[in-house]
Amino acid sequence: MALKHYNPTSPARRGLILVDRSSLWKGSPVKALTEGKNKTGGRNNKGHRTSRGIGGGHKQKYRLVDFKRRKWDMPATVQRIEYDPNRSAFIALVEYEDKTLSYILAPQRLGVGDSIVASRKADVKPGNAMEIGQAPLGTIVHNIELKPSKGGQLARAAGAYAQIVGRDKGMVMIRLNSGEQRYIRSDCMVTVGAVSNSDNANQNFAKAGRNRWLGRRPLTRGVAKNPVDHPHGGGEGRTSGGRHPVTPWGKPTKGARTRSNKATDKFIIRSRHAKKKR
């Protein structure tokens, strides 16, 4: 998908750059593959605000996307590529030979009418899913499982991908976009190709309202508040906060390490933080 640059016919159009979605499906999603979605406004079940900057936005239906791809050896045909308000990537509606419909993440270079298949070993072709241990070295993949049959968890955002760089004792080594290298079990499923809509990050919304349509509220800096409202607040004149960045509740933020799953540290060959540690 290309980027669309708008002429400044009004202040809200000056500098506006959006992804050209003219080739996407213009109708409604498949009703059987959608669910209702309640907005939380960033509040938990007690009504306490746990996430800042969330609220409002256009009403959305949740699309049931198949991240598992476990319908073995049954070819499917791409019916259409659709916009999905719940994620940055596009989704593809596919119809299997038994006439069942399913949504999958749309990879780059996948078009209407293309045939795809999920198998233990499949051709290296965008949209095909296979066990990562069967894919050749150097293959670009996305929607990567961390546990067999759990469904893809890595490389699902727009433009994301990982590359297979090696094999070792029933494990496969992959390199992620972040620079992290890690082991994945060879019987985990992956989908060939990079995720669609790689230009998503290059958009310029040009006005605050477009962020509000997406449910994003303005965020006030802590240093602009009073001491009662934020740990960075107060001070005479402009100050820098005087401490490492924290949330309104005093917890470290902006790059602070929060990873606590020590059990899977052994699968990480090279941390994405390796450059920062030097």
UniProtKB/Swiss-Prot annotation:
Question: What superkingdom heads the lineage?
Answer: Bacteria
Which terms under GO biological process does the entry name? cytoplasmic translation
Record-linked Pfam families: Ribosomal_L2, Ribosomal_L2_C
GO-annotated molecular function: rRNA binding; structural constituent of ribosome; transferase activity
GO CC aspect terms: large ribosomal subunit
Alphabetically sorted, this entry's keywords are: Ribonucleoprotein, Ribosomal protein, RNA-binding, rRNA-binding
Annotated function: One of the primary rRNA binding proteins. Required for association of the 30S and 50S subunits to form the 70S ribosome, for tRNA binding and peptide bond formation. It has been suggested to have peptidyltransferase activity; this is somewhat controversial. Makes several contacts with the 16S rRNA in the 70S ribosome.
**Assembly and partners?**
Part of the 50S ribosomal subunit. Forms a bridge to the 30S subunit in the 70S ribosome.
The record's comment on protein family reads: Belongs to the universal ribosomal protein uL2 family.
Protein name stated in the entry: Large ribosomal subunit protein uL2
Organism the protein comes from:
Zymomonas mobilis subsp. mobilis (strain ATCC 31821 / ZM4 / CP4)
